[in-house]
């Protein structure tokens, strides 16, 4: 329900008995949207703090990575846990990326999360959809690892570009 109000309509609504009944659903909808936004923002901030803690620790703290990987693993198992057969990269990889995009937008983070998820599902290969999910993650990592290393190389070695050739 969308209600557009201006000064004249607010004045006329306030004088009518419909004001409360008209504004009440809109107010509750706005409250719900605000609560959802605050929850998602706090979850994003929490994940960001955890990522900073993970990268600040030397060597990287695998307990923090496990906390970050758990909701992604659950989402991937919910989405791909019952699939059987072979992976169709043109269909399945974009779906995998859309699930990953919900949690993070950085390829380097995807790499760490996918490796952690893959490590967690390897011993339990007896479940129905796990070989499929394992193959799907491997295919994504075959794309993600080289592209991340190229970006990393460009970022760390850009001052050494040979311009003579």
From Swiss-Prot:
> Which InterPro entries does the entry mention?
T3SS_YopR, YopR_core
The UniProt disruption phenotype note reads:
Mutants lacking this gene are defective for virulence in a mouse model of septicemic plague.
Work out whether the entry's keyword set contains Secreted.
yes
- Tell me where in or outside the cell this protein is found: Secreted
Task: List, alphabetically, the GO terms of the cellular component aspect.
Answer: extracellular region; type III protein secretion system complex
| Role noted for this protein | May be involved in the regulation of the assembly of the type III secretion system (T3SS), also called injectisome, which is used to inject bacterial effector proteins into eukaryotic host cells. May control the secretion and/or polymerization of YscF/SctF, the principal component of the needle filament, thereby impacting the assembly of the T3SS. Involved in pathogenesis.
Tell me which NCBIfam families the record gives. type_III_yopR
Q: What is this protein called?
A: Type 3 secretion system regulator YopR
The species this protein was found in: Yersinia pestis
């Amino acid at each position: 329900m969308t209600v557009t109000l201006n000064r004249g309509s607010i004045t006329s609504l306030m004088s009518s008995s419909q004001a409360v009944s008209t504004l009440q659903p809109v107010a509750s909808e706005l409250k719900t949207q605000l609560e959802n936004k605050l929850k998602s923002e706090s979850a994003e901030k929490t994940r960001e703090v955890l990522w900073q803690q993970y990268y600040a620790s030397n060597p990287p703290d695998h307990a923090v990575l496990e906390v970050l990987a758990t909701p992604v693993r659950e989402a991937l198992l919910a989405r791909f846990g019952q699939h059987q057969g072979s992976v169709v990269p043109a269909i399945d990889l974009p779906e995998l990326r859309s699930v990953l995009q919900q949690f993070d937008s950085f390829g380097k983070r995807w790499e760490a999360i996918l490796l952690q998820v893959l490590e967690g599902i390897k011993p339990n290969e007896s479940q129905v959809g796990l070989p499929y999910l394992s193959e799907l993650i491997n295919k994504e990592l075959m794309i993600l690892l080289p592209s991340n290393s190229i970006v990393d190389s460009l970022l760390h070695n850009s001052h050494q570009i040979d311009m003579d050739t």
